[in-house]
Regions:
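A recurrent flexible, glycine/aromatic-enriched loop bordering the glycosyltransferase active site
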Residues: 207-229, 290-292
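N-proximal low-complexity "stem/linker" segments adjacent to membrane-targeting elements
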Residues: 2-66
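Short beta-strand-to-loop acidic/aromatic patch adjacent to the donor-nucleotide binding site
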Residues: 140-152
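A short, conserved alpha-helix in the catalytic core of glycosyltransferases
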Residues: 220-238, 243-271
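Active-site-adjacent helix/loop segment of glycosyltransferases
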Residues: 259-362
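Conserved donor NDP-sugar-binding/catalytic core segment of glycosyltransferases
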Residues: 152-194
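Glycine-rich, basic loop-to-helix element that forms the pyrophosphate-binding segment
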Residues: 118-137
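Acidic donor-binding segment of Leloir-type glycosyltransferases
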Residues: 66-117, 136
Length: 401
């Protein structure tokens, strides 16, 4: 049985400037949502979707969230492009149909959809933090389902698979999803592993998903795109550090969890189709779309800076002077290699990286102090979370994006 429900505006707080494309997309998708008794609502979960200036992927992601068999009780849309000046709330009802013979009328369950601005966020996780700080998220919420606007659930059971895994692995501190390309056929990663002072994937980026990695569970790191993050984890590990940026904050957060005695679990049955718009050059650093007829933007510098931040904070601070001197030698070698490959921009990036690292030492000092304070074991004491021998290693894409 299907029917249509019109969302009810419950917060008259948006001014004329807030009547934006993003509001129109949300309202249209809610108005056009086919109502189904096959859906249920879990009020313990709040989904947070961060949205950039580029809206090409958002409607597909929001629609995929609305199709979930288990809906989050709260769906937060965090706009990072100054289109939402004040919070706005919409609601819609779901009447789940229990299995078996129905003897009583099922009770309505309400889903809140909240639009908020996150204009000054410096990373994905910072936008999520800013969004949920602007309203009362509710005492019943126990976890956040974090999504980029270009990371859509690849099927209707994505959140359900996450919740089942959380129920069966209650000690998991963070649960991540299998990362696929936007069509949902090629793999990006299925969790990541520690390898010296970096993290690597044991997946060849783009290889067909044939469920060959679906036996994985405990890993060293997962992408935050599509991750289920318990609020207790955020509190226990002092939140996610935005200093690492969108390309690096997931690596640091997962590292602190693993070294602090927590568990990072990948749920291969939960599938996220991730366009990785900024990494793939489809989106500029400021969130604007790259024109279809223009060359893709090169994300090389942002990715390398994230890798460098991770490397510095992964060693004792007394090693930093030697690491910096070594980075100069490495920059010369990598710069020459990039020039030989006719990549002058990347060569310039490599040559400037040692100097770009210096202003960030204060942030690195704080990050390293947090790791030492929270850490209980070393990465070497976690052999099952280490990468295999070199022939089996494949460097994955940027974690958290």
């Amino acid at each position: 049985m299907h029917e249509r429900r019109t969302p009810v505006r419950t917060l008259e707080t948006m001014n004329d400037n807030a009547s934006s494309d993003i509001q129109g997309i949300v309202t249209d998708l809610l108005n056009g949502r086919p109502y189904s008794h096959r859906q249920d609502v879990d009020s313990s979960v709040a989904a947070v979707i961060t949205v950039q200036e580029d809206l090409r992927f958002f409607d597909s992601t929001f629609e995929a969230v609305l199709r979930q068999r288990i809906l989050p009780g709260t769906i937060v849309v965090a706009d990072c492009a100054r289109r939402v000046s004040q919070p706005m709330q919409l609601t819609f009802d779901v009447i789940p149909s229990p299995a078996g013979v129905i003897t009583t009328m099922p009770e309505n369950k309400t889903v809140r959809v909240i639009l908020v601005g996150a204009d000054h966020a410096v990373s994905f996780a910072d936008a999520v933090r800013s969004a949920i700080a602007q309203f009362d998220i509710g005492a019943e919420v126990r976890a956040l389902w974090m999504l980029h606007d270009d990371s859509r659930p690849a099927d209707d059971s994505c959140l359900e698979a996450m919740l089942d895994a959380w129920k069966n692995t209650p000690m998991a501190s963070l649960l991540g999803a299998k990362q696929l390309d936007w069509p949902g056929r090629g793999l990006h990663d299925v969790g990541m592993y520690a390898d010296g002072h970096k993290v690597v994937s044991l997946v060849v980026d783009g290889e067909p998903d044939q469920e060959q990695y679906d036996g994985r569970s405990d890993v060293f790191a997962v992408s935050l795109a599509g991750a289920l993050v318990p609020l207790a984890t955020l509190k226990a590990w002092d939140g996610i550090d935005p200093w690492f940026g969108t390309f690096g904050e997931s690596r640091d957060f997962c590292r602190r969890i693993c070294l602090g005695g927590g568990r990072v679990v990948v749920v291969p049955q939960a599938r996220i189709a991730h366009a990785r718009a900024r990494f793939e050059g489809l989106r500029l650093r400021n969130g604007h779309a790259v024109d279809d007829d223009a060359e893709p933007a090169d994300s090389y510098l942002a990715v390398r800076e994230a890798q460098l931040k991770y490397a510095y904070t992964d060693v004792h601070r007394t090693w930093w002077p030697l690491l910096w001197l070594w980075s100069i030698v490495l920059a010369l070698g990598l710069g020459v290699r990039c020039l030989a490959a006719k990549q002058p921009y990347r060569a310039c990036c490599e040559l400037t990286l040692p100097w770009r690292a210096l202003p960030g030492l204060r942030g690195a000092w704080r990050a390293r102090a947090r790791i030492r304070r929270q850490g209980k074991v070393s990465a070497k004491a976690l052999p099952t979370l280490q990468a295999g021998p070199p022939p089996k290693r494949q460097v994955g894409g940027p974690l958290g994006y």
